[in-house]
């Protein structure tokens, strides 16, 4: 460890992992003095009895409203509509059930709630200015998260949002320059006060969704290790999480999924994101910047893009810097003791590609519907402008041309 030491400030809510754990929801809300809650979900999740019925039972009389209207577009308008419903019912908390879009929408809803009667005006201002603050003189609604995917963005106090008041904004047909702009909000008070990772609910998620989200979550563990903001604490959680994920992710392709392996996958996804969104900064990095480059105009999960580009991005990183390759190799269980640095790097690249292949994800950008080589200059510009590129490993600073070359190699 560097003699300068380190700081680590990360304050997640209570975490419950295990089959049937959502039956503790009511008890947890009682412990937190929360009397009433609104269930927030997407339209599919919110109408799937195998998902929502156990949650309804767990919440009991504290469940007073449901808002099954989130979408992948996660617009400001959707969050504002959810807040209006929450106010009508007088709820104390939102229970977000589903994937990253739903969790982000719930956080934006909570951020708006901190502004009281000014929420609609704040939303309109955010569309104009790109700035969505949390009020300093108001408290956001409490958030409880019940993830059903493995993207690993749950233990976080930040959220992305599409800055449009149109709830039905369609981003898939738009390019980044033409569609509504993206924004974000971050505040320690948006960290979920409790999180429930229920294996029974994950069994209801389509295999393709689990697979793509798992690649996204897996890459968070990799990037925590070479982040310039890494600490011995995050090294420990990320490395252990990667081992658990390598043990457990194979369960996703099984029917039925093996209980022990699924348990490993859930424990792993919690571990790899523990400390990801610390007060010191966000510890995801260049691979996620590449994923964000496809976030507008492409109907594709971020994890699918990760699976394709991560091996190529890692090979580039290792060509520029050490990238803590020995630590990453150890975390992945690779026997590379005494091997040359370039051999270690290639073993890591191969291991990450093997995870992708085990998940059944595509290996080339040309195999993703809607992606064209002619889009690469625009995508490369978006990646180069992404905030997460600023927290790439020390010494890694790709030009737009180098980013475009990586995309070409992934084609």
Locate the predicted segments by residue:
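Active-site segments that bind and position negatively charged phosphate/pyrophosphate groups
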Residues: 227-343
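C-terminal charged capping/lid subdomain of soluble metabolic enzymes
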Residues: 335-411
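ATP/NTP phosphate-donor binding region
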Residues: 1-93, 366
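A glycine/threonine-rich phosphate-anchoring loop and its flanking beta-alpha core
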Residues: 5, 114, 118-231, 324-331
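Catalytic nucleophile loop
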Residues: 94-104, 137-153, 288, 302
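Short glycine/serine/threonine-rich phosphate/pyrophosphate-binding segments
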Residues: 22-25, 48-49, 76, 101-106, ...
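N-terminal small/polar loop signature for handling phosphorylated ligands or for N-terminal nucleophile
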Residues: 50-125, 129-135, 251-262
């Amino acid at each position: 460890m560097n003699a300068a030491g380190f700081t680590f400030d990360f304050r997640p809510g209570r975490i419950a992992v295990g089959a049937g754990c959502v039956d503790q929801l009511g008890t947890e809300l009682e412990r937190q003095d929360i009397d009433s809650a609104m269930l927030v979900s997407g339209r599919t999740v919110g109408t799937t009895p195998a998902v929502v019925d156990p949650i309804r039972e767990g919440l009991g009389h504290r469940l007073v409203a449901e808002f099954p209207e989130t979408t992948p577009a996660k617009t400001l308008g959707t969050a504002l509509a959810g807040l209006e419903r929450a106010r009508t019912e007088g709820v104390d908390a939102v229970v977000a059930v589903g994937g990253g879009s739903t969790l982000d929408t719930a956080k934006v809803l909570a951020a708006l709630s901190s502004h009281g009667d000014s929420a609609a005006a704040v939303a309109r201002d955010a569309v104009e200015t790109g700035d969505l603050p949390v009020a300093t003189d108001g408290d956001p609604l409490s958030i409880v998260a019940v993830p059903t995917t493995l993207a690993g963005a749950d233990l976080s106090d930040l959220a992305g949002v599409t800055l449009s008041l149109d709830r039905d904004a369609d981003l898939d047909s738009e390019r980044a320059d033409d569609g509504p702009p993206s924004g974000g909000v971050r505040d320690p008070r948006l960290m979920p006060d409790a999180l429930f990772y229920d294996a029974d609910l994950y069994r209801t998620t389509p295999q393709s969704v689990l697979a793509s989200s798992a690649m996204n979550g897996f890459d968070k563990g990799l990037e925590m290790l070479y982040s310039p903001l890494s600490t011995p604490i995050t090294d420990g959680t990320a490395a252990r999480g990667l081992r658990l994920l390598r043990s457990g992710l194979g369960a996703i392709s099984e029917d039925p999924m093996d209980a022990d392996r699924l348990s490993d996958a859930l424990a792993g996804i919690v571990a790899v994101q523990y400390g990801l969104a610390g007060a010191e900064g966000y510890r995801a990095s260049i691979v996620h910047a590449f994923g964000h480059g496809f976030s507008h105009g492409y109907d594709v999960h971020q994890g699918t893009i990760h699976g394709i580009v991560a091996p190529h991005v890692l090979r580039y990183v290792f060509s520029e810097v050490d990238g803590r390759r020995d630590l990453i190799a150890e975390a992945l269980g690779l026997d590379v003791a005494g091997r040359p640095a370039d051999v270690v790097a290639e073993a890591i690249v191969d291991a990450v590609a093997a995870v992708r292949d085990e998940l059944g994800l595509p290996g080339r950008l040309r195999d993703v519907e809607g992606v064209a080589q002619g889009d690469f200059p625009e995508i490369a510009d978006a990646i180069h402008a992404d905030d997460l590129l600023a927290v790439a490993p020390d010494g890694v600073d790709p030009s737009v041309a180098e980013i475009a070359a990586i995309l070409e190699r992934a084609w």
